[in-house]
């Protein structure tokens, strides 16, 4: 799901992106180490940190692509056709992304939900079209998302949350 930057988890502003596959999630802190000439031990910390998500959309249309691209592309849709239009936009608006994994445990549905608060796609749409006769004819759309700190949130909880039903 995707929503405008600043959207709370309980908001109804989330847009379903359709079926997809998440390939990876990674929290990437950039560490630093500084040692003064007269100090016995170095001081270590984190200078920057991002979260990265990669995956593939299986179901997508022009409206979904426009929404997740944060203004890089735009879309129109009618009852019979959807159209993506791109080129010339130079501002990408960060979005909030929420990825939900559903699993069945002993007959009970359990969810794991990953939410990043301020993120953008790393590139525009990419599709490798396949033949109808391909063993797997579904043309997926790969994506990569990079989330940055949302400094409007409390320190320590500015990048992402992961909740998992037990």
Q: Model segments located where?
A:
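Generic preference for hydrophobic/aromatic residues in regular secondary structure cores
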Residues: 1-3, 20, 32-34, 95-99, ...
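Solvent-exposed edge beta-strands and adjacent loop segments
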Residues: 1-65, 118-140
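Intrinsically disordered, low-complexity segments enriched in small/polar residues
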Residues: 4, 16-18, 35, 68-69, ...
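Short, solvent-exposed loop/turn segments that connect beta-strands within catalytic domains
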Residues: 8-9, 105-110, 153-155
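Beta-strand secondary-structure signal
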Residues: 52-56, 96-100, 142-146
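Low-complexity, flexible helical/coil segments
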Residues: 59, 87-97, 132-141, 153
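Short helix-loop boundary/capping segments
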Residues: 63-117
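Mixed-charge, glycine-accented linear interaction segment located at domain edges/termini
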Residues: 111-166
């Amino acid at each position: 799901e995707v929503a405008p930057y600043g959207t709370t988890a309980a908001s109804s502003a989330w847009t379903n992106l359709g079926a997809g596959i998440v390939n990876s999630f990674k929290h990437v802190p950039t560490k630093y180490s500084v040692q003064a000439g007269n100090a016995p031990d170095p001081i270590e910390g984190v200078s920057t940190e991002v979260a990265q998500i990669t995956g593939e959309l299986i179901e997508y249309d022009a409206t979904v692509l426009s929404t997740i691209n944060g203004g890089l592309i735009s879309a129109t849709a009618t009852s019979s056709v959807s159209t993506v239009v791109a080129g010339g936009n130079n501002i990408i608006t960060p979005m909030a992304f929420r990825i939900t994994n559903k699993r069945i445990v002993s007959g009970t549905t359990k969810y794991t939900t990953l939410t990043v608060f301020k993120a953008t796609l790393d590139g525009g749409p990419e599709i490798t079209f396949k033949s109808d006769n391909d063993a797997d004819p579904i043309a997926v759309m790969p994506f990569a998302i990079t989330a940055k700190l949302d400094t409007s949130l409390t320190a320590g909880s500015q990048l992402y949350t992961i909740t998992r039903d037990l």
